[in-house]
Amino acid sequence: MVELPDLLTDLFRRHRGRTALRTAGRTWTYEELDRVTSALARRIDAECPAGRRVLVAGEHTAEAVVWALAAMRSHAVHTPMNPGLPADRFEEFARVADAALLVCFEREALVRGEKAGLRALYAGDVGWPTDPAPAPADGTADEPARSRVAYSIFTSGSTGDPKLVDVGHGGLLNLCRSLRRLLDITPDDQVLHFASLSFDASVSEILGTLYAGATLVVPVRDQASWLGSVSRHLAAHGCDLAMLSPSVYARLDEAARSRIRKVEFCGEALGEGEYDKAARYSRVFNAYGPTEATVCFSLAELTSYTPSIGTPVDGFRAYVRDPDSGDHATAGTGELVIVGDGVALGYAGGSPAENEVFGTVDGSPAYATGDVVSLSDDGELTYLGRIDEQIKRLGHRVNLAHVGSTLSRHLGREVALVRQDATILLVTAADGEATEESLMARIRDLVPVWEAPDRLVLVDALPLTSGGKVDRSALRELLASPAGAPHGGTDGEDAAELRRVLDVVTAVLGQEIGPETSIFDAGGSSLAMIQIQVKLSDAYGEEAVEAAFAAMDYDFAPAAFLRHLRGEAVAPAESAVDTLLRRVETERDALRAELPLLRRDTRHEPVPGAADGDREVLLTGASGFIGGHVLDRLLAAGRPVLVVSTGDPDGVLTGHATRFGRQAADYARVRAISYAELERWVDRRRGPVVDAVVHCGYQVNHLLPLDSHLSGSVRNTALVVRAAAALGARSFAFLSAASAGADFLPLSAATLTAVGDPYSRSKLISEEYVNTLAVLGCAVSHYRPGLVYGHRPEDRHHLKDDWFTALLETARRVGAMPRLSGHVPVCDVGTLADTLLGRPDANPGTADGASRTPDSRSAVVVHRTYALDELLRHTGLTEADVLAPAAWFERVRDGGEVPAPLLAAMQAALSGPGWPSAHREVDHDILGRLLGTPPDTPAGDRPERTGTTAEAQNGAAHAPTPR
């Protein structure tokens, strides 16, 4: 039996010089993948004990594919996981996996990993896979034994709960051979990588391609949705083979479908309509295979439509089980039982009842699928359906009864899930309080998108049978009648109007969504939301559309948009801002009540290596641009520092030393811990004495939904506040953002409403939590800086996602600048770092904070501003090169070189009014130094200083909110 790591090693070396992996602007040969994945596998082995699971939480990038291959080659067990799972679901999956390591590609996942008790490795900290960080090696250690599990992968199973399938090595070679032979994959083929790594179809894509010596091509996500990006890629470049579900294929543009030479349908039953569309352009294959059968069990090439799912691939046999006798037959109709070495080893941690589907037939491993098939005498299979209520949506198995039970429990109301053709309706009784919108919002928080209903229907009462159960037959009749139509339903002109809105959404997302479906649940982004808003403004007017979007709190769903547009939005429903405020006030009050108890009950421990009475400065965000400079100044001052990090604590200090050219001895008085460790200190009421807190750690992303900020950076801020109370901090400096507003006002619905984007709202909420420290006499300061620069060469990687420098570079490249209103406020990182440290460094030996009068140095911080003419000079452009923003973005978008998230960030930033007046507080040209352009105007020609940071303290401000 060939094991997966050995199979990959053989393939890499067999096809050495050929191209194995390609994405825009980057290719890897098989030889390069051999070297890179081997090095990364060693890194995984250094972090994860042999035989334990490593969760790889990434998708749709070449980098994620490289790490997945590294995990397959390691001594750990590769276990891919969807990075977009709801937070509770993420923790549940991590618990089921009992993993020892999480590899992630977004920093938000680090927080989730720590919350789930996982050791986390951020791929960006390791380095781009072509130059991986060296892993420690122990030449005296024996090579650990390989696990009998080749990989583990999640499936929801027939219960709807996550099940982790352990797949052995036995069926992998047969899978590769069968795919190459039956799909006619040649070394010259370009194979599309579409599936998320968390779907086992990705195993077929990756291993089938590598076995044949072909090239796996990963499209760049340059559209609002992954599907839209893939459709655009296919229209431009085509592919030789795509493995897609019928529902995905149906949503591809005609231009994309016409460029696919071969298409293998999988994941769902293939209908005649999809076959006819595909057969116009492509060779068509139909595949079938549960996760428990090493991806693919049967495969057929279709030359005319038939529901056949083919014959078993190499190494498998098919039987049908008679439901009455339990006998297994080689022909007939019944439950399909798969037999062969490719049958999975079982469900990890599954109960005996769950694992009853695994057994043996004639001494060989067998799996009872729960699928009803017809098996002909010559071995051809026809899929007929499920033997239970389970259906398949978006590649996941979903049991409607289980989902209904889950939602009934969490919503506190009786619900019924009903199928109407391909649409899933959730039906519940109207009670005069909950609305369709509020219920759908809660449902989206409770279950992943593939379990969420397409529509929600409120009825007067759920019909019951004589036995007291919901009468689904009567319910379907009720829904079919005019009286039972969904509340807010449309017909005639209303239906036509809804159709127009849906068409706009389809044009932007590249796929059709349900009327009540949020575009974010459908994979859309903030950029997509902006594009939809612009298109709808052309039809309905800018003010009306803006009001409707604001009323929806920018969580756009087509039918909800029309209700708000017509003034039909449910009046009794609490507004999104009011709901948010109530939630924040509840958590703030609980925090305020807890802080004195934490201060009273925490036992303080001596700081290792510190003199008596020497207190540490607690610093977050040391791996970030600003926080790194703050740490460098603390080191220069000789202060003891406690660094709290979302990443690997030791890696933060190593990275800082490299970035600032420091030696290990410089960090003798520095300790680094994780947020999870800090939380343990707080919860057990024991820890060191802290003098001051400087909180710089925050994920800067104006496009993330507010819930992501609340569960990530805001949650971390609340933890740091609790730690400040427990560890006796006498001052707390919080690095906020100028986009949170110019005035330091009490938090209210009005102040939240005045701040447009979720990131800035989250900063206001974090400030409110920090303010609770006033009950302890802790001096709190919030600093709201403009755009912060002063990057040295070692800091340049921090500019990767910076919208403003990206805008300037794009302006240089396209030879045009968008017309900006007002000025751009900028800060110097060195001056800002000194400001943040003004309090902890001023007098570290002052009296205990409890006896101090609480004060604040809160300020909006701007060191100088830049007007349009200055930006033109820095980019080498003139007034003649200035375009209206809409025209400029159209030119840039057509060029296709700016990543969609950066483009969306630019658009969001330029939608604001800008800084109203010129301001200069530093003598040097911050942007000139950054961009390497000549010095600016002589001192005599400069505008007068119009204010200083100090003037904004205690509520004064320079100007309205900047971009």
Curated annotation (Swiss-Prot):
Span of domain Carrier: 492-568
Any one GO BP annotation for this protein: secondary metabolite biosynthetic process
Stretch list, region Disordered: 928-963
A GO CC term attached to the entry: cytosol
UniProt note: phenotype after gene disruption: Disruption mutant does not produce chloramphenicol. Mutant does not accumulate 4-amino-L-phenylalanine.
Catalyzed reactions: 4-amino-L-phenylalanine + holo-[peptidyl-carrier protein] + ATP = 4-amino-L-phenylalanyl-[peptidyl-carrier protein] + AMP + diphosphate
Domain of life: Bacteria
TM segment ranges: none
Endpoints of the signal sequence: none
Residues found modified as O-(pantetheine 4'-phosphoryl)serine: 526
The protein's Enzyme Commission number: 6.2.1.-
Disulphide-bonded residues: none
A Gene Ontology molecular function term of the record: ligase activity
Pathways involved: Antibiotic biosynthesis
InterPro entries the record matches: AA_adenyl_dom (IPR010071), ACP-like_sf (IPR036736), AMP-bd_C_sf (IPR045851), AMP-dep_synth/lig_dom (IPR000873), ANL_N_sf (IPR042099), Epimerase_deHydtase (IPR001509), NAD(P)-bd_dom_sf (IPR036291), PP-bd_ACP (IPR009081)
Note accompanying the cofactor annotation: Binds 1 phosphopantetheine covalently.
Cofactor(s) annotated in UniProt: pantetheine 4'-phosphate
Assigned keywords, A-Z: Antibiotic biosynthesis, ATP-binding, Ligase, Nucleotide-binding, Phosphopantetheine, Phosphoprotein
Entry text on domains: Contains an N-terminal adenylation domain, an internal peptidyl carrier domain and a C-terminal domain that is homologous to nicotinamide-dependent dehydrogenases.
Function description: Involved in chloramphenicol biosynthesis. Activates 4-amino-L-phenylalanine by adenylation and loads it onto its peptidyl carrier domain, via a thioester linkage to the phosphopanthetheine moiety. Can also adenylate tyrosine and phenylalanine at low rates, but not L-p-nitrophenylalanine or threo-phenylserine.
Family affiliation: Belongs to the ATP-dependent AMP-binding enzyme family.
Entry-linked PANTHER family: FATTY ACID SYNTHASE (PTHR45527:SF1), NONRIBOSOMAL PEPTIDE SYNTHETASE (PTHR45527)
The protein's name: Non-ribosomal peptide synthetase CmlP
Native organism: Streptomyces venezuelae (strain ATCC 10712 / CBS 650.69 / DSM 40230 / JCM 4526 / NBRC 13096 / PD 04745)
